C-alpha cells in the first residue's frame, strides 16, 4: 500500500486526509525508519508495509469505534511502542487528546521527538508499566473515554491491564489478529469482573499479498468500576491470567 493507496483506502471509509496530514504520515515514516537503525522499534520498515500494517491498521480502529472520527475523546494507548495505534489516530483526528504509556524510556523519548517534529499537541507521554499506570490510587485510574491496545498479549491479560484506565461509560478497543473467538471465550468472565462488557467485534481484512490478513477489533464497554485489587502487581496478569473467574 503506497501513500496514495493509503489515502484512497481511507477515503473509501469516509476518512479524508488533507495534504498536510499526508505530509505528517510521510515524515512519521521517515523518522521511524531512521530511528529504527539504532533503536528496535519495528520489524516492518518497507514503506508499503508501514503504510499498510502500521498506519492503515491503526486507523481501522475508527471503523469499529466511529466516535474517534468526530468527538474530542481522551484516548489512552497502553504499550504503544512506536506510537501505534494512537499517533496515526491523532494525525487523522487532531481533536483527540492522547496519553501514551510505555515501559521503555527510549521509546518514550522517540515519541517525544516525533510529536515535536510533527507539531502534534495534546499528546502526553508516560513512562510506566501497564500494571501500575492505572492501579488503585493512580490519578489516571478510570479517567479515559477510550483505551487502546495493539499488543500481542491475550485478551484476558489486556483486559486486566487496560480496563482500569477506562472511565465508566467509556470503552476499551483491542486490536487483535485472527481467531479472536477463542480468546473472547476465555476472557469474558474476567472482562465482566473488571467492569467491562463486550459490545461487539468488527472483522476486516488488510489487503496484504499474497493473502489478505484478517483483523478483529474488539470493543469492550466499561459499564462498572474496576475492583480496587486490579490490575495486580507487575508480571502477575500475564503469569496468572484471570481465567475461569
UniProtKB/Swiss-Prot annotation:
Protein name (record): Ribosomal RNA small subunit methyltransferase G
Function field: Specifically methylates the N7 position of a guanine in 16S rRNA.
Subcellular location: Cytoplasm
Gene3D superfamilies, A to Z: Vaccinia Virus protein VP39
Species whose genome carries this gene: Limosilactobacillus fermentum (strain NBRC 3956 / LMG 18251)
Gene Ontology MF, one: rRNA (guanine-N7-)-methyltransferase activity
UniProt cross-references to InterPro entries, sorted A to Z: rRNA_ssu_MeTfrase_G, SAM-dependent_MTases_sf
Pfam families named in the record: GidB
Keywords, in A-Z order: Cytoplasm, Methyltransferase, rRNA processing, S-adenosyl-L-methionine, Transferase
GO CC term, one of those recorded: cytosol
Entry similarity comment: Belongs to the methyltransferase superfamily. RNA methyltransferase RsmG family.
Native organism taxonomy: Bacteria, Bacillati, Bacillota, Bacilli, Lactobacillales
Keyword match Manganese: no
Taxonomic superkingdom: Bacteria
Binding site for S-adenosyl-L-methionine: 79, 84, 130-131, 150
Amino acid at each position: 500500500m503506497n501513500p496514495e493507496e493509503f489515502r484512497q483506502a481511507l477515503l473509501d471509509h469516509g476518512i479524508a486526509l488533507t495534504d498536510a496530514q499526508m505530509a505528517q504520515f510521510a515524515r512519521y515514516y521517515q523518522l521511524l525508519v531512521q530511528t529504527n537503525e539504532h533503536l528496535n522499534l519495528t520489524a516492518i520498515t518497507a514503506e508499503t508495509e508501514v503504510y499498510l500494517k502500521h498506519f492503515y491498521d491503526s486507523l481501522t480502529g475508527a471503523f469499529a469505534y466511529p466516535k474517534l472520527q468526530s468527538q474530542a475523546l481522551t484516548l489512552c494507548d497502553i504499550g504503544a511502542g512506536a506510537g501505534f495505534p494512537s499517533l496515526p489516530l491523532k494525525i487523522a483526528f487532531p481533536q483527540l487528546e492522547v496519553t501514551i504509556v510505555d515501559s521503555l524510556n527510549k521509546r518514550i523519548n522517540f515519541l517525544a521527538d516525533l510529536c515535536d517534529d510533527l507539531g502534534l499537541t495534546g499528546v502526553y507521554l508516560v513512562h510506566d508499566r501497564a500494571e501500575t499506570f492505572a492501579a488503585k490510587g493512580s490519578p489516571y485510574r478510570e479517567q479515559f473515554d477510550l483505551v487502546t491496545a495493539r499488543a500481542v498479549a491475550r485478551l484476558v491479560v489486556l483486559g486486566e491491564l487496560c480496563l482500569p484506565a477506562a472511565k465508566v461509560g467509556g470503552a476499551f478497543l483491542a486490536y487483535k489478529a485472527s481467531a479472536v473467538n477463542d480468546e473472547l471465550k476465555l476472557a469474558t468472565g474476567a472482562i465482566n469482573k473488571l467492569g467491562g462488557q463486550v459490545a461487539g467485534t468488527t472483522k476486516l481484512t488488510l489487503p496484504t499479498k499474497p493473502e489478505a490478513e484478517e483483523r478483529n477489533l474488539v470493543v469492550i464497554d466499561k459499564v462498572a468500576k474496576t475492583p480496587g485489587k486490579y490490575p495486580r502487581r507487575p508480571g502477575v496478569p500475564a503469569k496468572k491470567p484471570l481465567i475461569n473467574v
